[in-house]
Amino acid sequence: MNKIEMKSNKFKNVISDVNEKLHNYKWEESYKIIINALSENPDAPEPHNLLGLWNEFNKNYDLARKHYRAAYALDPTYKPASINLERVCTMFSSRNVPADFGEVFEKSTKDNTNLKNYNKEKEMKNNDGQ
């Protein structure tokens, strides 16, 4: 196992642990885990996203936005940060969007075949209707 895989597995464990603690309202325990993860790797978006969630759940929305922005700035492809940032910055329309803990791990290469096929079918229908 290389260093990147080890780091990825470690963050999966941290995310899972913090997720469980936040859902059980264990604020101090979750905060300590997040700060520890942040101090070990300040350039990773995951701890900033989790700290944003922690602040949001504690109704400190300004600090939550700052950490979501930090996570997004560190890795613009990290979707949980952009989802959470959009939700917390949008006044009304995104309030029903659930918090994204980053617990769903995506593959780095995405298969857009279904989307391409859908777009082709849609385009063909539009051309037939004209």
Role assignments for model-derived ranges:
Residues 1-13, 39, 95-96, 100:
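TPR-adjacent "capping" and linker segments in tetratricopeptide-repeat scaffold/adaptor proteins
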Residues 10-11, 45-46, 79-80:
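Helix-start (N-cap) detector for alpha-helical repeat units in TPR-like alpha-solenoids
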